Amino acid sequence: VSRAVYLTEDVPDGAFYRFRPTTWGDLSAGTLQVMTQTTGALAWVTVPNPIGTNPPTRRQVPNTKVFNGGEGTVMVGSDVVWTTKGDNRVWRYRPSTNTLRVVYNAATSSNPILSGVDNVTQLHGNLYVCEDGGDMQIVRIKPDGTVEAAVQASSITGSEITGVAFSPNGTRMFFFSQRYPGAT
């Protein structure tokens, strides 16, 4: 099992990172790496200056794989799943084989009901993705790729659904409907 913390970056030219702590459980020291891709092959390269003020971490390593507005991440077994809001995609990275695939892409989906992808969680292999805007839904992506609305909230301009989570026994879903400033 890979002992790493995976991080997204919420900018249009963002990267995908992994942090390998020197001592597992202590995040005060370790190595920050960025995903790179050349000729289809993925690799992890150490970021020279993890403080990353100038230049930012995403611009320090050649061939950094770009992700358009990284958002939520969740572990599904030993795989890492995350969303990118700029292109409405859901990604899945498998550390054991160092492979990456797109689980959902609104631009090519036969059922593009999910837009404004944001937070993601999972239960029993199903992915649950919150929409930041879109139709104000939490959308379920089943292991076979089927996409369907799981929750529909009433739409209020400027609102978003966020923070989807399940109770430890999986019988209750929780989420937050963030309202625009001034709404009650």
Range-by-range predicted roles:
Residues 1-184:
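Sequence/structural signature of beta-propeller domains
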